[in-house]
Amino acid sequence: MATVQAFPMRALPGEQIAATLNQVSKNYGAVQALKNFSLEVRAGELTAVLGPNGAGKTTAIKLLLGLARPTSGRVSVFGGDPTALETHLRVGAMLQVGRVPESLRVHEHIDLFSSYYSQPLAIKQTLAIAGIESLRDRKFGELSGGQKQRVLFALAICGNPDLLFLDEPTVGLDVEARHLLWDEIRQLLTLGKTVVLTTHYLEEADALADRVVVINKGSMIAEGTPQEIKARTAGKKIRCTTRLSVGVLRALAGVVDVQDDRGTMVIHTSRPEDVLRELLNRDLAISGIEVTGAGLEDAFLALTQEKAN
């Protein structure tokens, strides 16, 4: 794996737009995956696209990659058609459905994928950025799930793309490997690359994103910096040890969601004072109470529940 290193802060991104979805709707039969959806991906930024399963994230990515056509509206990448060859030469993608032959060695895969591009990175540089120098001569089929993820990341960047799509890139990685990949993504941003990231790890979006877009039921429900998204909810997170069940806690007024973290209840709430009062009334033996400010996860839960209601 690549050595962890500090990356310099990059200059503030300009207003140049790398890709757009303009009033796009996409229907699959009677199902409307996107409804009058608009999005601007700004050059030099990392845009994180968040949403529950089935929200429309994958459909939006497919449209930007030219893998699907909109039912209505306009899709543009670098001012042109996303299906055009000249567009594909400037785009890299790491998708969840990515599969490659298991019998080829890692360097053979990189060499093959690099041949599709006019100005690819040197294989040595690709291996270094992805932190897989030690896997160079290994067959893909011999690798662990996490190692395969890193090779797929290498294949996404080997063409030296200007626009990079990363769909759940850290799935299967342990915490250390995940943070190393974050550093590698930051390095790409310092080189002026544009990244569109989808992830279920909300701390990942919080750590990496310049802008966050939240989608639910085919519509954009929030857009802004991570700080702006978090500021949209006045919620708090209450941690405590209580005899009350998850079901009882979820039924309390003002509770957005509840998780059982190995016996400690984590309560996301928009009305912390009311919830605390109710907890103390219902469980005199409650202990370990801790109240913290809302994070991106809390804001995400509040926004998506608001849309559902």
Where are the regions a protein language model picked out?
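Conserved protein kinase catalytic domain
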Residues: 88-92, 127, 230, 276, ...
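ABC-family P-loop ATPase nucleotide-binding domain
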Residues: 1-25, 306-309
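C-terminal coupling/interaction segments
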Residues: 2-7, 270-309
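ABC transporter nucleotide-binding domain
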Residues: 182-270
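Short alpha-helical
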Residues: 82, 101, 118-121, 203, ...
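ABC transporter nucleotide-binding domains
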Residues: 16-19, 26-197, 202-203, 207-216
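Solvent-exposed beta-strand sheet faces enriched in polar/charged residues
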Residues: 22, 78, 241, 290-292
